[in-house]
């Protein structure tokens, strides 16, 4: 059944580029956005908090790719400097609920919460306590946050 596949010439050079979480090594024509976002988040390399950022634009213009690209470089640099910087990326459309978004925050810092059953306030308290006890800077990315608002009917 699979012999033909194993012998055949692959259609793709690299199937990884088809994954929805793939970020290329280079982002052509996004140098200005990369530089600008990099400047905003760079204070964490010296142990300071960075500003909150709200990025919006049309679908497919590279917002997520730029953010993931810059933050991967930031984490790499922080590691070289011995800084405690972590990134928690959450696609709110995929997470679906505020509870799952908060539980993703918890998971990113090693705090376990049950899949369901706790009040949102309790999950947030566990996250806050866990974050404070670990003494690290956490950058949280909430991609497609509008999905949570639309699902709640607030729009």
Task: Give residue ranges: language-model regions.
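Mid-core helix/loop region of P-loop NTP-binding domains shared across ATPases and GTPases
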Residues: 2-14, 19, 47-50, 84-86, ...
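Dynamic helix-loop-helix/coil hinge segments at AAA+ ATPase domain boundaries and subdomain interfaces
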Residues: 17-35
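Intrinsic disorder
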Residues: 27-31, 92, 153
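Pre-Walker A adenine-sensing motif
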Residues: 35-46
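Conserved helix-loop functional segments at active or binding sites
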Residues: 43, 76, 111
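Walker A/P-loop nucleotide-binding motif
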Residues: 48-73
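Short, well-ordered alpha-helices that flank and scaffold nucleotide-derived cofactor binding pockets
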Residues: 72, 76, 107
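Flexible phosphate/Mg2+-sensing switch loops adjacent to catalytic phosphate-binding sites
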Residues: 77-85
